[in-house]
């Protein structure tokens, strides 16, 4: 039976640590000019319900560097856009391809695809979770902090898919996470409850960004209005007043803190230009590490590494 990568909570800490170690190894090999055709001749179907820059490019380049081929599929120009049942698509793609990555809206779409696919399914993003991005983020922290143990992580902004997945990561890896979200924009209640049961006291939630950021070693933020929420932009701008990660807020963190943002960034809204361009920013390393983290996931699921 194929193993999927749908959310972090499907994996143990040890399994995720092995994926991170492989990602770091693959990155080092690439930097030294080495090749690792671990998926030679294999094809990854890449289904996109949402527009994409980093997800598409990092998966397409990644499968190529592993010796395979990425096949881009837009739901709008395929039979999925005309109502073909997802379970039929899953079965057919499983006959043609060796793995499926999907970037979509509802988590239930990814779950249904995985239920009927006989090849690995990778969650490239849903409205609930963004596991590939968090693996890249944790990898970035390991590179710049030597690990994640004993660090305080802070999240400032919307309780979106990134926040939900950081909550999972904190509970699984065992680090402290302080989230600051405006009232009414908190993370998913079920995810919070799961983390509270899995790792009591590791995850805290406040409406005060200063409280969350104080003493933090890692600060993370994201856009206030995710894709599909554009109509809420003006309302959210009002609700998120005081939640911009600017120099004053970042100054409350540990002096040697690092700043992460999954991109795209709306400078002057959730993060200031000076912070994202500042000496504590590791945003570009983070973006690069999407490539390496996803290569490790693909190599493990599709190649049995």
Swiss-Prot record:
<feature type="binding site">
    <location>
        <position position="222"/>
    </location>
    <ligand>
        <name>L-ornithine</name>
    </ligand>
</feature>
<protein>
    <recommendedName>
        <fullName>Ornithine carbamoyltransferase</fullName>
        <ecNumber>2.1.3.3</ecNumber>
    </recommendedName>
</protein>
<dbReference type="GO" id="GO:0005737">
    <property type="term" value="C:cytoplasm"/>
</dbReference>
<comment type="pathway">
    <text>Amino-acid biosynthesis; L-arginine biosynthesis; L-arginine from L-ornithine and carbamoyl phosphate: step 1/3.</text>
</comment>
<dbReference type="Pfam" id="PF00185">
    <property type="entry name" value="OTCace"/>
</dbReference>
<comment type="similarity">
    <text>Belongs to the aspartate/ornithine carbamoyltransferase superfamily. OTCase family.</text>
</comment>
<feature type="binding site">
    <location>
        <begin position="226"/>
        <end position="227"/>
    </location>
    <ligand>
        <name>L-ornithine</name>
    </ligand>
</feature>
<feature type="binding site">
    <location>
        <begin position="52"/>
        <end position="55"/>
    </location>
    <ligand>
        <name>carbamoyl phosphate</name>
    </ligand>
</feature>
<keyword id="KW-0963">Cytoplasm</keyword>
<keyword id="KW-0028">Amino-acid biosynthesis</keyword>
<dbReference type="InterPro" id="IPR024904">
    <property type="entry name" value="OTCase_ArgI"/>
</dbReference>
<feature type="binding site">
    <location>
        <begin position="262"/>
        <end position="263"/>
    </location>
    <ligand>
        <name>carbamoyl phosphate</name>
    </ligand>
</feature>
<dbReference type="GO" id="GO:0006526">
    <property type="term" value="P:L-arginine biosynthetic process"/>
</dbReference>
<dbReference type="InterPro" id="IPR006132">
    <property type="entry name" value="Asp/Orn_carbamoyltranf_P-bd"/>
</dbReference>
<feature type="binding site">
    <location>
        <position position="290"/>
    </location>
    <ligand>
        <name>carbamoyl phosphate</name>
    </ligand>
</feature>
<dbReference type="Pfam" id="PF02729">
    <property type="entry name" value="OTCace_N"/>
</dbReference>
<dbReference type="InterPro" id="IPR002292">
    <property type="entry name" value="Orn/put_carbamltrans"/>
</dbReference>
<feature type="binding site">
    <location>
        <position position="103"/>
    </location>
    <ligand>
        <name>carbamoyl phosphate</name>
    </ligand>
</feature>
<comment type="function">
    <text>Reversibly catalyzes the transfer of the carbamoyl group from carbamoyl phosphate (CP) to the N(epsilon) atom of ornithine (ORN) to produce L-citrulline.</text>
</comment>
<dbReference type="GO" id="GO:0004585">
    <property type="term" value="F:ornithine carbamoyltransferase activity"/>
</dbReference>
<keyword id="KW-0808">Transferase</keyword>
<dbReference type="InterPro" id="IPR006130">
    <property type="entry name" value="Asp/Orn_carbamoylTrfase"/>
</dbReference>
<feature type="binding site">
    <location>
        <position position="79"/>
    </location>
    <ligand>
        <name>carbamoyl phosphate</name>
    </ligand>
</feature>
<dbReference type="InterPro" id="IPR006131">
    <property type="entry name" value="Asp_carbamoyltransf_Asp/Orn-bd"/>
</dbReference>
<dbReference type="GO" id="GO:0042450">
    <property type="term" value="P:arginine biosynthetic process via ornithine"/>
</dbReference>
<keyword id="KW-0055">Arginine biosynthesis</keyword>
<feature type="binding site">
    <location>
        <position position="161"/>
    </location>
    <ligand>
        <name>L-ornithine</name>
    </ligand>
</feature>
<dbReference type="InterPro" id="IPR036901">
    <property type="entry name" value="Asp/Orn_carbamoylTrfase_sf"/>
</dbReference>
<dbReference type="GO" id="GO:0019240">
    <property type="term" value="P:citrulline biosynthetic process"/>
</dbReference>
<dbReference type="GO" id="GO:0016597">
    <property type="term" value="F:amino acid binding"/>
</dbReference>
<feature type="binding site">
    <location>
        <begin position="130"/>
        <end position="133"/>
    </location>
    <ligand>
        <name>carbamoyl phosphate</name>
    </ligand>
</feature>
